[in-house]
């Protein structure tokens, strides 16, 4: 007797990591800047014959501190991260991203093609956030490689200079990333102080 498979219109739930709830401090790109970044990504894909899904506009960001991954979001870590960020005061600053590369690590079918760049002020903000996180009992990094992920693909692009993407960082945010669902929840944001000349 044969069995018949029925499709009731229910799609399979996305596969998620064992620790799917990520807590991260980041600079989310404002929409006009993100649109410019996606234009650059599209041009790079066309020039290299790459077909890959671009990162969503509202997910384009510069990671400042990857705090932790958990099976569920823990309020005590959210509280400590907010307290750390509250202790850091920063003035608005400019950044410039003018190189594009594909990171060699990761899964062979999911290598990240990114914009590279930054500024001294960005490095300083990241380091001070790291110190504040550590003093609040959390993991904090004191240095990093500033980048903006554009897309993931099995193909790499040749490292190259591009027309600079310049913008002003006016805020940073604590984000709960629901890994595997492509969903960001902004828990709190901090405005940088206006620049005075």
Which positions does each model-derived feature cover?
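Histidine-dependent nucleotide/RNA phosphoesterase domain, centered on the 2H-phosphoesterase fold
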Residues: 1-197
